[in-house]
Amino acid sequence: MAIHNCEGENVSTENKAVYMDNSATTPVRKEVVEAMLPYMTENFGNPSSIYEIGKTSKHAINLARKKAADALGAEENEIYFTSGGTESDNWAIKGIAFANRDKGKHIITSSIEHHAVLHTCAWLEGQGFEVTYLPVDKYGMVSPDELRNAIRDDTILISIMFANNEIGTIQPIKEIGEIAKENQIYFHTDAVQAIGHVPIDVKKLNIDLLSLSGHEFEGPKGCGALYIRKGVKIDPLLHGGAQERKRRAGTENVPGIVGLGKATELATAEIEESNRTLLKLRDRLIEGLLKIPKTHLNGHPTQRLANNVNVTFEYIEGESLLLLLNAKGIYASTGSACNSSSLEPSHVLTACGVPHEIIHGSLRLSLGRMNTSEDVDRVLEVVPEIVQKLRNMSPLTPKEYRTL
């Protein structure tokens, strides 16, 4: 994959550039781009219009809706297109909260959710709602028993992410869904990281609302969806039009929706084959990185996404590691891309009990369809050298871990 710097020049590295930040965003697949292009040019009609090119756009949206529904085991009229995961999370949580506040004002979520969920819940607390933030174990796993104990008579919503964006831990979604159903509480899951990696059937898992975002599985940025089970009582987030069956106002992003539909279709059809490849690469990465002394794996050892590697190196700063990796043409992150500019320690690793003194030394490598065995070789060649270089420079590194 050809990658350029901000001046548009080729990145100079000993080998090709290696992109391992697919949990932040993914390149758009060629097939997805090809599906989108006609709706940026000749098929540009507004779907609300009654003339032919408007009808063509409307038909394209309906086809994309069917593809998204099929991927989730949902019905077509349960899929609503949005601008992405953040809007979907906001709509699900605020929409349920305000539509059902006559029944109660208590919401349950976890301490490791994406900030789109956490910040929305914090905002609702300012509006008079109460939120319980469930703790997680050292692997980032929510306890179903703790969830049961947190339920109150006035609990109206449980929002637990399907898989964590930083550490890749997959939650016991089926059990959580059963608990929610038993107690007649709405269950929302942020599945932004899970689509294309974990098979999802919303009916079998008792999911009432599910958020997804196209750019996380080789679809376009700026387009997502919210699954809302038929019969769920929810208020709109946006007002000003009758689009999306009067629930989500605003002229539809037809090219984005078409791309989302195609990306969803491809990603879900290829889960088995993709996971086989990704698991081999992931496990090689983990095995190789853990050979570096004083390195720890974050997240569940087995119940994790096939593309996720998150490790902590003692005695180094993750920001310095990323800068040196960037100079070598390796692109990774320390955690959530939506919070990458913050110097605050990861709220996810903090919740998992990672000691404060080493929490800043984390590295997330998230694999994608384009990654190869050679990419893994390159990372395993470069990372140990950089870690050692940084340890040699750090006054915190004990003598036995220096090579000066």
Curated annotation (Swiss-Prot):
The UniProt record lists the EC number as 2.8.1.7
Which coarse location class applies to the principal site listed for this UniProt protein?
A: cytoplasm
What cofactor does this one take? pyridoxal 5'-phosphate
- Extract the Pfam families matched here: Aminotran_5
More info: In Archaea the pyridoxal phosphate cofactor is not covalently bound to Lys but ligated by other amino acids.
Known role:
Master enzyme that delivers sulfur to a number of partners involved in Fe-S cluster assembly, tRNA modification or cofactor biosynthesis. Catalyzes the removal of elemental sulfur atoms from cysteine to produce alanine. Functions as a sulfur delivery protein for Fe-S cluster synthesis onto IscU, an Fe-S scaffold assembly protein, as well as other S acceptor proteins.
Name of the protein in its database record: Cysteine desulfurase IscS
Q: Which organism is it from?
A: Methanosarcina thermophila
